[in-house]
């Protein structure tokens, strides 16, 4: 009987704390409503800059040392078959005055 009471107390405490985390506890409903409209406006606002999904190209700004202009060049691979063409790896190197430098 004692263990049953302890279990009931624990479960009520556990679920009570779970609900307290997810339910808003505002004493003024109008303040909660204003906050929600502000949050919705922020979600609907378009970003100032466009973000592209995926990884970025390597940066060659410091790869060539004092040589300039240091620019990024894509190294091409010849794939063995047409089926492998979609998964053919892409590699980059930094070039300055016909000399190649490794990408940092």
Curated annotation (Swiss-Prot):
<feature type="disulfide bond">
    <location>
        <begin position="64"/>
        <end position="70"/>
    </location>
</feature>
<comment type="subunit">
    <text>Interacts with ERECTA and ERL1, but not with TMM.</text>
</comment>
<protein>
    <recommendedName>
        <fullName>Protein EPIDERMAL PATTERNING FACTOR 1</fullName>
    </recommendedName>
</protein>
<keyword id="KW-0732">Signal</keyword>
<comment type="similarity">
    <text>Belongs to the plant cysteine rich small secretory peptide family. Epidermal patterning factor subfamily.</text>
</comment>
<dbReference type="GO" id="GO:0005576">
    <property type="term" value="C:extracellular region"/>
</dbReference>
<comment type="function">
    <text>Controls stomatal patterning. Regulates asymmetric cell division during guard cell differentiation. Mediates stomatal development inhibition. Not cleaved by the protease CRSP (AC Q9LNU1). MEPF1: mobile signal controlling stomatal development in a non-cell-autonomous manner. Uses ERL1 as major receptor. May act by competing with somatogen (AC Q9SV72) for the same receptor, TMM (AC Q9SSD1).</text>
</comment>
<dbReference type="GO" id="GO:2000122">
    <property type="term" value="P:negative regulation of stomatal complex development"/>
</dbReference>
<keyword id="KW-0964">Secreted</keyword>
<feature type="signal peptide">
    <location>
        <begin position="1"/>
        <end position="20"/>
    </location>
</feature>
<dbReference type="Pfam" id="PF17181">
    <property type="entry name" value="EPF"/>
</dbReference>
<keyword id="KW-0325">Glycoprotein</keyword>
<keyword id="KW-1015">Disulfide bond</keyword>
<feature type="disulfide bond">
    <location>
        <begin position="67"/>
        <end position="96"/>
    </location>
</feature>
<feature type="glycosylation site" description="N-linked (GlcNAc...) asparagine">
    <location>
        <position position="98"/>
    </location>
</feature>
<feature type="disulfide bond">
    <location>
        <begin position="60"/>
        <end position="94"/>
    </location>
</feature>
<dbReference type="GO" id="GO:0010374">
    <property type="term" value="P:stomatal complex development"/>
</dbReference>
<feature type="disulfide bond">
    <location>
        <begin position="79"/>
        <end position="88"/>
    </location>
</feature>
<keyword id="KW-0217">Developmental protein</keyword>
<dbReference type="GO" id="GO:0010375">
    <property type="term" value="P:stomatal complex patterning"/>
</dbReference>
<dbReference type="InterPro" id="IPR039455">
    <property type="entry name" value="EPFL"/>
</dbReference>
